[in-house]
């Protein structure tokens, strides 16, 4: 199984980082987990065309995690010779989001149907949506997945995914604080991908901003680097993969971020720029 951090950014715009998105490749499947701003461009940089993505897993409905979903859907539809709908698996509410997105894209679809006979013959732009919750399971080709509860309150629901292929396990959490559901999802995983923030840097930034309370509010519903490392150690994870860096990680700060994790977790800690990857 190969994990590629397509986007390691966050809601804070960063010219060096796309929004939250992770690519998992296993058993001939290309699976995107979340689809933040710029994810499609990073997908191409990873050598994967939109039509090669079979499924997008969505952890929760915060805008920074789904901004590029419409681009993924449209690009697949326009570029593929055969209309194969994207499969989107996410928490309750994702169907309404996709329906609204398709309504937004209706004029574009009509323009393209009017201009391209073969595209019109392929049929309408559609998406296969599956709403899931903790305890549910699914398959993507030879990859099996289970759904686990995470804690991003007041965001409800929020979920994570445990993907397995040929004895290897990758656990992927979106935004969450440590909780039993994440521990269960990560148990003995070969890799655990966690979005993180730096409490110390966020607090300092909040103190410097006139509307700093808004920044300070995010401290209570994200995992810190240290907490992610503690979860990894507690769950017996082999590799800890960090992403969604808040505030944006500046070049040269990697060792500082990694040191906060290695103080609590003895295994490999993977972090870095977009397109950083690991195979397990």
State what each model feature region is.
Residues 1-171, 177-180, 184, 256-279:
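Binuclear metal-dependent hydrolase catalytic cores
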Residues 169-171, 177-274:
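Cap/insert and terminal regions of metallo-dependent hydrolase folds
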């Amino acid at each position: 199984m190969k994990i590629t951090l397509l986007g390691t950014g966050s809601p804070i715009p960063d010219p060096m980082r796309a929004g939250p998105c992770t690519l998992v490749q296993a058993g001939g499947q290309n699976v995107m987990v979340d689809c933040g701003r710029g994810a499609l461009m990073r997908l191409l940089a990873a050598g994967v065309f939109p039509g090669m993505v079979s499924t997008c897993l969505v952890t929760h409905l915060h805008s920074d995690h789904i901004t590029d979903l419409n681009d993924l859907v449209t690009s697949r539809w326009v570029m593929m010779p055969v209309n194969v709908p994207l499969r989107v698996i996410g928490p309750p509410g994702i169907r309404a989001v996709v329906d609204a997105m398709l309504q937004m894209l209706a004029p574009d679809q009509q323009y393209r149907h009017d201009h391209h006979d073969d595209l019109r013959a392929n049929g309408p732009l559609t998406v296969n949506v599956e709403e899931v919750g903790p305890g549910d399971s699914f398959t993507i080709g030879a990859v099996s997945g289970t759904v686990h509860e995470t804690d991003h309150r007041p965001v409800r629901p929020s979920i994570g995914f445990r993907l397995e292929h040929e004895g290897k396990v990758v656990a992927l959490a979106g935004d969450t604080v440590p909780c039993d559901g994440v521990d269960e999802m990560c148990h003995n995983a070969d890799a655990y991908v966690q979005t993180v923030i730096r409490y110390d840097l966020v607090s300092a930034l909040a103190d410097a901003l006139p509307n700093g309370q808004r920044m300070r509010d995010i401290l209570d519903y994200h995992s810190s680097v240290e907490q992610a490392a503690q979860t990894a150690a507690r769950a017996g994870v082999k590799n800890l993969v960090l992403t969604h860096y808040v505030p944006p990680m500046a070049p040269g700060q990697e060792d500082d971020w990694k040191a906060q994790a290695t103080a609590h977790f003895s295994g490999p800690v993977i972090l870095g720029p977009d397109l950083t990857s690991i195979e397990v």
